[in-house]
Amino acid sequence: MAVGILEVSLISGKGLKRSDFLGKIDPYVEIQYKGQTRKSSVAKEDGGRNPTWNDKLKWRAEFPGSGADYKLIVKVMDHDTFSSDDFIGEATVHVKELLEMGVEKGTAELRPTKYNIVDSDLSFVGELLIGVSYSLLQDRGMDGEQFGGWKHSQVD
């Protein structure tokens, strides 16, 4: 099993649907990978419809690991101060091939790509620009000559 760092570059959003009657939204993104959730900052400019984050979110990722769901669930939320946050929509980013390539080559990258955001009715509510990379961590364990705590020496 290989261990590495999965990094998501959350760049921007475009045409996000308003969830408030007042027309302004304060969008942020929650990204879940294998039960671990990371949150972006809240974008405040442009009334929230075309936000820019430029955030980097990271996970420790094992491949192959437990379970078969090698995907990122990306949820766009509207931050509300006096009530619970509103769900705007979500997208799924599949990363299995990225992890496979990263394990094979040491590093792999999905260049920034547009992902459609859909709401609970599967209606289009905007898009996100997201890049993803995976970098294998160096093996800090055996050096090839150590076994069970003993290091073999050569006898002449």
From Swiss-Prot:
InterPro entries: C2_dom, C2_domain_sf. Ca(2+) 1 binds at residues 20, 26, 78, 80. It holds the Pfam family C2. Ca(2+) 2 binds at residues 20, 78, 80, 86. Ca(2+) 3 binds at residues 80, 83, 86. Induction: Regulated by ARR2. GO terms for biological process: defense response. Binds 3 Ca(2+) ions per C2 domain. SMART domains: C2 (SM00239). It comes from the Eukaryota. Gene3D superfamilies: C2 domain. Residues 1-108 form the C2 domain. Keywords: Calcium, Metal-binding, Plant defense, RNA-binding, Transport. One of its GO terms (molecular function) is RNA binding. Its cofactor is Ca(2+). PANTHER family: 16 KDA PHLOEM PROTEIN 1 (PTHR46502:SF15), C2 DOMAIN-CONTAINING (PTHR46502). Binds to both sense and antisense RNA. Can also bind sheared DNA and dodecamer DNA with a low affinity. Interacts with mesophyll plasmodesmata to mediate its own cell-to-cell transport and potentiate RNA trafficking. May play a role in plant defense signaling. This is 16 kDa phloem protein 1. It comes from Arabidopsis thaliana (Mouse-ear cress).
